[in-house]
Regions:
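Beta1/beta-strand and adjacent pyrophosphate-binding region of the FAD-binding site
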Residues: 2-12
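N-terminal Rossmann-fold NAD(P) dinucleotide-binding loop
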Residues: 15-16
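Glycine-rich FAD pyrophosphate-binding loop
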Residues: 23-43
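Active-site-adjacent segment of FAD-dependent monooxygenases/related oxidoreductases
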Residues: 48-114
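A conserved beta-strand/loop element that lines the FAD pocket in flavoprotein oxidoreductases
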Residues: 116-129
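Conserved FAD-binding catalytic core of PHBH/FMO-like flavoproteins
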Residues: 127, 137-151, 157-270, 274, ...
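Short FAD-binding loop at a beta-strand-to-alpha-helix junction that anchors the flavin cofactor
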Residues: 279-295
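C-terminal helical "tail/cap" subdomain of flavin- and related membrane-associated enzymes
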Residues: 313-404
Length: 404
């Protein structure tokens, strides 16, 4: 058995950042991650200026930017073959005025490496939580399995950071509000060549939507399909899928043969939801565990990081003093619910009004809507979506205690 002041379930962006911040504050914390490493492909890899600002405030940015990554300081989309400029990050008030693309495993390994210098923090890999321990209506720990057998972790506070398929929130019986999603996403990779066009994030055709992310030696691609349509894609065969991809991005036509079979594709079943209540006595949920986000805008990592920073800001001092109450847990939801609602509302609008018509073949007019045409023609207006996308709604800053 392990005893800890705080037990964080899940070593994703929210869990690792919160573990770092609590360990930095000298709070006895353990992070439980079910996998042996962070090497999961086709996870979110969009690092927004808001996240790099947090790295800057923690004194980690210089080392962080030594990791392999690519950068874009403007967002462009292609609609019916026409390139449209949407956002310009070069004027936002942040340490980094661009979006970085970095494999999530590099991001998490970096945080884990930096966090291990804090003696108050333990990171336990290959530790899968199977149940919550409750006594007299209060969560007091978790049960887990490890390669060495069963493990019990007792903690004054358990924090669920285990993502959209959270075992913690299911075990806790917390109510989920499903906002719906009409899409799923197929992730795959295709090699990149020197003569390829520059970064155009989205390519919208009459019945296709393809996202292409530059990962230096290859393109990480996301092909949007209608919710539940994976069976139809399989029935049509891999050759038909290759032709569709080539039609969506003609510069990939000579390389789609690299998709040998459907084993080269990974399905992301998109959901947009949030818990009606993020906590119960002894338990708090943050990140995707509290609010599953659509891939629209690539904001998942960054909202999770913002949740972690807000949680540390609100709770770390009280944890240091041994003065944390169950009412304090409610402050996290009160702080973070408004930004989550705003972003989810925007994501649902894009899904319903743009992506659903596109993938269902209902989009007849591929002329960019008037507001996108306005953005394309006004450099000043492009600063506003950059501010919203890059920094988010009511961005957090590090105010939790430093090393003790």
């Amino acid at each position: 058995m392990i005893e800890s002041q705080v037990c964080i379930v899940g070593g994703g962006p929210a869990g690792m950042m919160l573990g770092y911040l609590l360990g930095r504050a000298g709070i006895d914390t353990c992070v439980l991650e079910k996998h042996a490493d962070f090497l999961r492909d086709f996870r979110g890899d969009t690092v927004h200026p808001s996240t790099m600002q947090i790295m800057h405030e923690l004194g980690l940015l210089q080392d962080f930017l030594q990791l392999p990554h690519s950068e874009i300081d403007q967002l462009r989309a292609e609609i019916g073959g026409r390139s449209v400029r949407i956002a310009d990050f070069r004027h936002i008030p942040a340490a980094c005025r661009y979006i970085a693309f970095m494999p999530q495993w590099d991001f998490l390994n970096f945080l884990a490496e930096k966090a291990r210098r804090f003696s108050a923090l333990r990171i336990l890999m290959q530790t899968q939580v199977t149940a919550l321990i409750e006594e007299r209506g209060r969560v007091v720990g978790v049960e887990a399995t490890t390669p060495g057998g069963a493990l019990q972790v007792r903690a004054g506070l358990v924090i669920g950071c285990d993502g959209r398929s959270s075992a913690v929130r299911q075990a806790a019986g917390l109510k989920v509000q499903d906002l719906g999603s009409p899409i799923d996403v197929l992730w795959f990779r295709v090699s990149r060549q020197p003569g390829d066009p520059g970064q155009v994030l989205g390519r919208l055709g009459r019945d296709t939507m393809l996202i292409t992310i530059d990962r230096s030696s290859y393109w990480q691609c996301a092909f949007v399909i209608a919710k539940g349509a994976i069976g139809q894609v399989h029935a049509s065969g891999i050759e038909a899928f290759r032709r569709t991809v080539a039609g969506a991005a003609d510069f990939l036509a000579g390389r789609v043969h690299e998709l040998q079979s459907f084993d080269d594709l990974k399905l992301l079943s998109v959901s947009v939801d949030r818990l009606t209540t993020w906590c119960k006595p002894g338990l708090l949920c943050i990140g995707d565990c509290a609010h599953a986000m659509s891939p629209v805008g690539g904001v998942g990592i960054n909202l999770a990081i913002q949740d972690a920073v807000a949680t540390a800001n609100l709770l770390a001092g009280k944890l240091q003093r041994g003065a944390l109450t169950d009412r304090d847990l409610e402050l996290v939801q009160q702080r973070r619910l408004f930004p989550v609602k705003v972003i989810q509302r925007m994501q649902v609008a894009v899904q319903d009004r743009v992506l659903k018509p596109a993938v269902s073949g209902a989009m007849r007019d591929l002329t960019p809507p008037w507001f996108l045409q306005l953005l394309d023609h006004s450099a000043w207006l492009r600063r506003w979506p950059a501010q919203l996308i890059g920094l988010g709604v009511r961005p957090e800053h590090v105010r939790s205690p430093g090393p003790v």
